[in-house]
C-alpha cells in the first residue's frame, strides 16, 4: 500500500496494559477507528455508555494498524464520517466528547443534552440591533416577546 502499517506488538502491549487496570473486564469495549467502520452516532454513544464501564480506543496512523490486533481483541471498527483523516486522534476526540455528554453529571444542565439542540440553527445575544458595515441586523421580534410558546414554534420552523 501507499503508507506504513503500525506493528502489532506495541499496540498489543498498550491494550494489555490498559486492560490490566480494569476491574470488570466483561464491560470493556475496544474500538478501532476506520473510514470503513460502522457509522458513529449519538445513539451508538448512548448505548455504549449504558453497556460498558471502560472503552479502549485504538487511534491508528499512516495506513493503519496490523489487522491481527483487531482480531485478537475483537475490536469494533467505527467511522466518524465518510472521509479519510491522517489519523485516529480526531475521531477519538469526537467519540470521547459525544460519549462524555451521555454520562450523568458531565453537563451542568440536563437541557444541554436535548437532541432538539441538533436541529437548532440560529442563536442570538445582545445587542438587540447589531450594525456591521452600515447594515442593521436585528434579533427576531418573536425572541424578544417573552412568549415561550411562540418562541418554540419559531425554533421548530427554523
Each language-model region and where it sits:
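Short Gly/Pro-enriched loop/turn and capping motifs at secondary-structure junctions
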Residues: 62-64, 85, 129-131, 147-150
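N-terminal nucleotide/polyanion-binding subdomain common to many enzyme families
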Residues: 2-19, 145, 149-158
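S-adenosyl-L-methionine/SAH cofactor-binding core of RNA-modifying enzymes
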Residues: 5-61, 66
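Short conserved micro-motifs on helix faces and helix-strand junctions that flank
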Residues: 4, 57, 79, 143-144
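Structured adenosyl-cofactor binding patch, chiefly the S-adenosyl-L-methionine
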Residues: 65, 69-112
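Short hydrophobic "helix-edge" motifs at membrane interfaces and signal-peptide entry regions
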Residues: 50, 71-72, 136-138
Amino acid at each position: 500500500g501507499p503508507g506504513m502499517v503500525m506493528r502489532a506488538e506495541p499496540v498489543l502491549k498498550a491494550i494489555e496494559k490498559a486492560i490490566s487496570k480494569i476491574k470488570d473486564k466483561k464491560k470493556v469495549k475496544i474500538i478501532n477507528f476506520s473510514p470503513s467502520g460502522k457509522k458513529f452516532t449519538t445513539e451508538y454513544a448512548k448505548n455504549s455508555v449504558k453497556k460498558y464501564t471502560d472503552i479502549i480506543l485504538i487511534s491508528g496512523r499512516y495506513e493503519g494498524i496490523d489487522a491481527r490486533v483487531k482480531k485478537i481483541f475483537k475490536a469494533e471498527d467505527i467511522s466518524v464520517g465518510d472521509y479519510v483523516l491522517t489519523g485516529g486522534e480526531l475521531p477519538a476526540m469526537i467519540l470521547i466528547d459525544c460519549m462524555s455528554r451521555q454520562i450523568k453529571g458531565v453537563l451542568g444542565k440536563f437541557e444541554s443534552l436535548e437532541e432538539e439542540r441538533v436541529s437548532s440553527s440560529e442563536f442570538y445575544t445582545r445587542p438587540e440591533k447589531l450594525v456591521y458595515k452600515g447594515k442593521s441586523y436585528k434579533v427576531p421580534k418573536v425572541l424578544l416577546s417573552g412568549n415561550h410558546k411562540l418562541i418554540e414554534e419559531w425554533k421548530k420552523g427554523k
